[in-house]
Each structure stands twice: as structure tokens, then as C-alpha cells.
């Protein structure tokens, strides 16, 4: 993109965007999906504000918007939708709920992102190998071919699950040690961010197990005995 195009793009106003829309013979904004998409793609406030989160499967607001958001989560709420509809109504005369819903779906899908994948791809390796020393460093395990191999396998599986969701990996890394040894802390470190970690699996027969798994990267099953108390 040329510098001139970038400057012009950044200087767009709501009036500029209105000029890009289709209007009726009487000058009213047509209630079309195309018009709504044009607004969401070009409005100085809404542009790139709504993205589909491939990890959670939900739509997120990822930048500042002209209404108060009391929830720390980026996930779009009903209140966000109401405020967005009011913004489109006030600035562009777009009021059709069907049109707005379709426009949001199209644009968010065009702007989809994966927070963990984006994080991984932002990293630059400093040339220092760490996997082979992870278990000895954090948990005091003996450094051996086994501890090195099992950690490499687990980390490769974690990365693979991000790039190929659902890839087969049915091996559990089991840590045995006294309470307070740092086992849970270790898994939290692996998850990088608290919201990507969960230890909320009390029972395998929990009817909400799939919902609890969603949106997390590293899952800790606190007690292995749960495997034996749940029906197979």
C-alpha cells in the first residue's frame, strides 16, 4: 500500500464513509448488508474493532469503542450489540437488525484471529534451549532422556493443537510430588496467561466438561484418582 493510500485511509471520517454508501432516490441510506459491511470496514472507530476469536469461537471487541465497556472480557455482549446498533443508527441510518447481524458476522469472520497463535508467532527465539531443563529447573526432576523426551512431546503437542485443533494427542503428563511442590504453578507457567489455563475439571462425567475445555490451552487435572471415580 502506498503512503498516500495509508494517509487517506486514516483520515476517513463518518462523512467520508457515508459518501461510500448506497442511497435511495430520496437520499436515505439503503438497508443493505453491503452498506453495513462498508461501514464496519471503514468507519474510523469501528474499523478492525470486531474480530472472530478462533480459540473461543466468539466475537471479540479488540480496540477502544465509543461506549463504556464494564466487562474486562473482549467478548461481545448484548450491551455491545445495542450500543453498536445505536451508533450505526445515529451515524449511518442503518437500523435493520438482520442487516447489522449479517454485517457483523461477515466482517468479524474476515478479521478472525487466534490469540495464542498470534502470541506464538510474535516470539523470537534467543538461541537458548530450554525444554530439556524445564522439569529439572521448575520441579527438581532428574534430567534424563525420559524427562527431556516427555517434555518435548508435551510441548510439541501443545503447539500442534493450536495449529491443528483436534489433532490426536491422548497422553497425559503426570506429575507426582508433595503438595506445594509447584506442580500447578508449573502448568500455569506453560499456559503463559491465566485465561489460557484451567484446573476446573472436577469429574470426567461433568456434563459441562466440553464447555470447561473451551477457550483454554493447558488443562490440569488436579487429582489422578478422578479417572477412577468417573464411569468409563
List the predicted regions and their residue ranges.
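Conserved small/polar residues in nucleotide/adenosyl-binding loops
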Residues: 228-232
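Hydrophobic "anchor" residues on beta-strands that sit immediately upstream
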Residues: 218
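Walker B catalytic acidic pair
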Residues: 222-223
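N-terminal nucleic-acid engagement/recognition segments and initiation subdomains in replication
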Residues: 1-130, 145-149
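P-loop NTPase catalytic core of nucleic-acid-dependent motor ATPases
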Residues: 104-215
Amino acid at each position: 500500500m502506498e503512503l498516500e493510500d495509508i494517509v487517506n485511509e486514516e483520515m476517513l471520517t463518518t462523512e467520508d464513509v457515508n459518501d461510500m454508501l448506497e442511497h435511495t432516490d430520496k437520499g436515505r441510506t439503503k438497508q443493505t448488508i453491503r452498506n453495513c459491511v462498508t461501514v464496519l470496514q471503514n468507519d474510523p472507530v469501528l474499523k478492525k474493532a470486531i474480530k472472530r476469536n478462533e480459540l473461543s469461537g466468539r466475537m471479540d471487541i479488540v480496540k477502544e469503542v465509543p461506549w463504556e465497556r464494564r466487562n474486562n472480557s473482549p467478548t461481545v455482549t448484548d450491551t455491545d450489540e445495542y450500543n453498536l446498533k445505536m451508533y450505526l443508527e445515529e451515524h449511518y441510518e442503518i437500523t435493520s437488525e438482520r442487516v447489522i447481524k449479517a454485517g457483523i458476522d461477515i466482517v468479524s469472520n474476515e478479521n478472525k484471529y487466534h490469540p495464542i497463535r498470534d502470541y506464538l508467532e510474535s516470539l523470537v527465539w534467543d538461541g537458548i534451549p530450554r525444554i530439556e531443563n524445564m522439569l529439572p529447573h521448575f520441579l527438581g526432576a532428574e534430567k534424563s532422556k525420559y524427562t527431556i523426551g516427555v517434555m518435548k512431546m508435551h510441548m510439541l503437542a501443545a503447539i500442534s493443537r493450536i495449529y491443528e485443533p483436534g489433532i490426536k494427542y491422548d497422553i497425559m503428563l503426570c506429575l507426582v510430588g508433595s503438595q506445594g511442590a509447584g506442580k500447578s504453578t508449573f502448568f500455569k507457567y506453560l499456559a503463559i496467561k491465566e485465561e489460557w489455563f484451567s484446573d476446573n475439571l472436577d469429574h470426567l462425567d461433568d456434563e459441562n466438561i466440553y464447555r470447561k475445555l473451551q477457550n483454554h490451552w493447558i488443562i490440569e487435572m488436579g487429582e489422578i484418582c478422578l479417572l477412577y471415580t468417573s464411569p468409563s
